[in-house]
């Protein structure tokens, strides 16, 4: 017989043996599984009444024990018998009672419970009005900068300021804005102010002035006016008027200032909510710090911005509308 045929026959026989062995093993495992399942069910059914009886016995023993504790001395023998017959259960009840006693917490009437107080965050209130400039610079946030709109800060900075504007004698005249023309009423008691105005009108003055007046039968609200001045970088300072410094530091040189054209020419910040004025005056003393032409351009832009925000009109020293030609004339005076 050929060798290949022999090998094929042996392989088929081995395969049949493996298949038969697998079928036999599977049947044996199934039979064991069903047998265990039947045994488990049978044992459970047998055990169930035993457990119920045990639980009933335990409950009955516990009730008997409690009843025996309440009996008189005449029943001591029966109590001792019940105690001896149910000693494990009594031991369990005693342990439960000890644990219950340990869990009891006694609190005296006058004692207060101990609470764990959580530390609460309380923001620190810093009185910036009572701080000096050096302390402000150390405590201020570099990203935030100095809040120049704070009234207390402005008052303190104004007290420290050593700068002077004009001749410390400048007061601004009142004005009446009529339908046909704009006229200014000069205060009679301020002779020094009259001299400054006359010199300004004659062209012999060392001041350059611009006026921003309200429309007819209207006025500038104090809150709106101060808000606009703060946004433009003005700082309330000496003589109770606003000044535009080189920077936000009040110790820096003054470029130009803003005053009230109504007597006495100051701004009452304490009653700023009730403050109204018909106009303001922007003035710059010559020569000014730095580039005079650049400073004058800055003052002109500030006047136009104030007039735009407050719905006012920019007027020259000669009480004329400030137009492009007037602006060129102003710039020619300092060039």
From Swiss-Prot:
Lipid bilayer topology: Single-pass type I membrane protein
Role description: Essential cell division protein that stabilizes the FtsZ protofilaments by cross-linking them and that serves as a cytoplasmic membrane anchor for the Z ring. Also required for the recruitment to the septal ring of downstream cell division proteins.
Family: Belongs to the ZipA family.
PANTHER family: CELL DIVISION PROTEIN ZIPA
Alphabetical list of Pfam families matching this protein: ZipA_C (PF04354)
SMART domains: ZipA_C
Top-level taxonomic group: Bacteria
Cellular component, GO, one term: cell division site
Natural source organism: Histophilus somni (strain 2336)
Main subcellular location: membrane
Gene designation: zipA
Protein name per UniProt: Cell division protein ZipA
